UniProtKB/Swiss-Prot annotation:
This is Serine/threonine-protein kinase shk2. InterPro entries: CRIB_dom, CRIB_dom_sf, Kinase-like_dom_sf, PAK3-like, PAK_BD, PH-like_dom_sf, PH_domain, Prot_kinase_dom. It is an enzyme of class 2 (transferase). CDD domains: CRIB_PAK_like, PH_Cla4_Ste20, STKc_PAK. Its EC number is 2.7.11.1. SMART domains: PBD, PH, S_TKc. The lineage of its organism: Eukaryota, Fungi, Dikarya, Ascomycota, Taphrinomycotina. Keywords: ATP-binding, Kinase, Nucleotide-binding, Serine/threonine-protein kinase, Transferase. Coiled coil: none annotated. It holds the Pfam family PBD. PROSITE patterns: CRIB, PH_DOMAIN, PROTEIN_KINASE_ATP, PROTEIN_KINASE_DOM, PROTEIN_KINASE_ST. GO terms for molecular function: ATP binding; lipid binding; protein serine kinase activity; protein serine/threonine kinase activity. Residues 23-125 form the PH domain.
Length: 589
């Protein structure tokens, strides 16, 4: 039956329709409590979700609804701590000047809770009226009569104009726009000497890392030199292959490969490069560099690495160095490894050498079947750092995703092994901070390991939260984009985004420019699947456990390892088919 509510035709299921499930998306028993009447007990109600409304009935046989909410009036759906399996709805009241009210709904189990939340939030978002709303006065952003942005710093206006964020979105969600601009501008205005950098690189390229590599054609890498702000237009899965690195002049510098550096690793001959005299502005940093360099010397092998390794060819390249395949020679004992991956880093290009030291230390200490094995490291002429690690000959998960459609059993296996590695790190108070398919490697046997510890951080007893902005934005948790304190659960969010990669071949918002992607993460929170009907309830439940906005309710790695979805993981050997299928298509040995 159709009723007109505030001029909008609303479908309210009748008892007859309810019995026949006509027009009903979902229905079921819930326990209800209104926020404004917290002193009253929870009451049992029959909840019915239709295409554009949510109705509450006294019972499953009631003829008419006690309360009907328009989905477009629902402002937020979130977990609540009032009961174990409980969520809260925030909505506009139709009787009290459209003020925001709330109610809490409790259900039988966790999966049912997430299913209700997913169905309501996705349909509420789709039913929003597209007309602009008045901007919030506490956020100083607006548009004047001539269509110009007002109330923003000039630099932010330039960023906004370069992005694909619309003026209507600025009016509707000014807070999310401010958060995105503030986050992005801080990366432009801050050098890597004072903040950890982050990357909009969406390719399997090693960055300022000592541990990751991929099998790529280096000649296909794009060079990017842009002054000011560049509007990015991403139209295909083949993503930009350049890490954005910025200085105070807002210049995005290209990666220029040092030819002498390449020659040195391929031939074993190292060319000395004159070191510029220290200026007053860099003296204190150089002192820190010397200290880090001294510690590096103490932690590496002093012998000439050329005696032990026969470098074959380049595997991958990043903004800070290259990764090479090498054969172990000269009687060097590296356990079962006869082939290794060598990451060569030019330390003169690294403004924060202590980060490299931290990365090596974490990797050396993180001995686990699901973490790439660190083998050795060498410092050549106090400039080139060679980090030797096990060679994962099947490449990255990104390569697999691009060539093959994964089954849920295969996704479960990859999630299980990745969760084990994450749990190992979290148990030692280490956050990876850059979990994504690029940083999950496989070998020909189907073994799965986490790599790239360039962004990792340690938490202490006194400091169990961080606020630094690192990682790859498309995989970032909302609390990082909003610059709130965060902990180990940012890795769980990134794992959830990686699951969407495995389902849909790419993370959410990949085709958006970076500023708009940050805006959408801040605005939308939990992303929605493009075709949720093709995904099983068990996988959706696991995904929701990873992508809960409220970190209190977001699962830990240990909790995920007990989830029933992982019970359907295929044997490791079953991954061989997609590995060799991908190799056959790309002619990789």
């Amino acid at each position: 039956m159709l009723l007109s509510v505030r001029g909008v035709p609303v479908e309210i299921p009748s008892l007859k329709d309810t019995k026949k499930s006509k027009g009903i998306i979902r229905s079921g028993w819930v326990m209800l409590k209104e926020d404004k009447m917290k002193y009253l007990p929870w009451t049992k109600k029959w909840l019915v979700l239709s295409s554009n409304s949510l109705s509450i009935y006294k019972g499953s046989k009631s003829e008419s609804a006690q309360v009907t909410l328009l989905l477009k009036d629902i402002q937020k759906v979130e977990r609540s701590k009032s009961r174990t399996f409980c969520f809260k709805l925030r909505f506009k009241s139709s009787t009290k000047n459209f003020e925001i009210q709330a109610c809490e709904l409790s259900v039988a189990d966790n999966m049912e809770c997430y299913e209700w939340m997913d169905l309501i939030s996705s349909r509420a978002l789709a039913s929003k009226v597209s007309s602009p709303m008045n901007p919030k006065h506490q956020v100083h952003v607006g548009i004047d009569n001539e269509g110009n942005y007002v109330g923003l710093p000039k630099e932010w206006i330039l960023l906004l104009q370069s992005s694909s964020i619309t003026k209507q979105e600025c009016m509707e969600e000014p807070k999310a726009v401010i958060q995105a601009l503030d986050f992005y501008s801080k990366q432009l205005d801050t050098t890597s000497e004072t903040k950890d950098s982050f990357s909009f690189c969406k390719e399997t390229l090693p960055r300022s890392s000592t541990t990751s590599y991929s099998i790529r054609d280096a000649d296909k890498h794009h060079k990017l030199t842009t002054s000011g702000v560049t509007k990015m237009n991403i139209t295909e899965r083949c993503k930009p292959k350049t890490t954005i690195q910025t200085d105070k002049k807002h210049i995005i510098r290209p990666f220029i490969e040092d030819k002498s550096h390449v020659e040195s690793i391929m031939t074993g001959k190292v060319t000395k490069v004159p070191v510029k005299a220290d200026s007053k502005n860099t003296l204190s940093r150089r002192m820190t560099d010397r200290q880090a360099l001294a510690m590096l010397k103490d932690s590496v092998t002093s012998h000439d690495p050329v005696e032990y390794f026969n470098v074959k060819h380049k595997l991958g390249q990043g903004a800070s160095g290259s990764v090479y395949l090498a054969k172990v020679v000269g009687g060097k004992q590296l356990g079962i490894f006869d082939s290794v991956a060598i990451k060569s880093i030019d330390l003169q290009c690294q403004t924060r050498k202590e980060l490299i030291l931290n990365e090596i230390t974490v990797m050396r200490e993180s001995i686990h079947p699901n973490i790439v094995t660190y083998l050795d490291s060498f410092l050549v002429r106090e400039r080139h750092l060679w980090v030797v690690m096990e060679y994962m000959n099947a490449g990255s998960l990104t390569d697999i995703i691009e060539k093959s459609k994964l089954t849920e059993a295969q996704i479960a296996r990859i999630c299980l092994e990745t969760c084990k590695g994450i749990q190992h790190l979290h148990a030692r108070n280490i956050i990876h901070r850059d979990i994504k398919s690029d940083n999950v490697l496989l070998d020909n046997s189907g073994n799965i390991k986490i790599t790239d510890f360039g962004f990792c951080a340690r938490l202490s007893n006194r400091t169990n939260k961080r606020v630094t902005m690192v990682g790859t934005p498309y995989w970032m948790a909302p609390e990082v984009v909003k610059q709130n304190e965060y902990g180990t659960k940012v890795d769980i969010w990134s794992l959830g985004i990686m699951i969407i990669e495995m389902i849909e071949n790419e993370p959410p918002y990949l085709r958006e420019d970076p500023i708009r992607a940050l805006y959408l993460i801040a605005k939308n929170g939990t992303p929605t699947l493009k075709k949720p009907n093709l995904v099983s309830k068990n996988l959706k439940s696991f995904l929701n456990s990873c992508l809960t906005i409220d970190t209190i309710f977001r699962a830990t790695a240990a909790e995920l390892l007990t989830h029933s979805f992982l019970n359907q993981a295929c044997p490791t050997e079953d991954l061989k088919s997609i590995i060799f299928s991908r190799k056959a298509n790309t002619h990789i040995n």
